[in-house]
Regions:
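Interaction-mediating elements
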Residues: 1-110
């Protein structure tokens, strides 16, 4: 049930490959099955972060299994390596969602 939303002002040529790779990373970092990771990307977004230099905002949501202090570096490094975005132009938001507020297959997890 981890969900990652990637919004970037950069152009991403192979979105499917990037989504597959970031799904594997999130699965590994949360210790959740890759089959439950949902990933979304929006590239070429209008994002202003002091200027128009390429930047990226990532939203990561999950029922537990989030450790922002340990996850921030590998996720930032991934974005930098795959999209060429400088580390200082990457924001990441982590949200631990209560099981009672997350549904799948017609019912909530808690």
């Amino acid at each position: 049930m981890p969900y990652i939303n990637v919004s970037t002002s950069a152009k991403v040529n192979d979105k499917v490959k990037l989504l597959e790779e970031i799904s594997i990373l999130i699965s590994s970092l949360t210790n959740k099955s890759r089959s439950f990771v949902m990933a979304k990307i929006e590239d070429n977004c209008q994002i202003y972060f002091d200027d128009e230099t390429p930047s990226c905002f990532l939203e990561i949501k999950s029922i537990g299994s989030l450790n922002p202090s340990e996850m921030a570096k590998p996720i930032s490094d991934f974005v930098h390596q795959k999209m060429g975005i400088p580390l200082e132009r990457i924001y990441i938001s982590f949200e631990d969602v209560p099981a009672s507020l997350w549904a799948w297959n017609g019912r909530t997890f808690g």
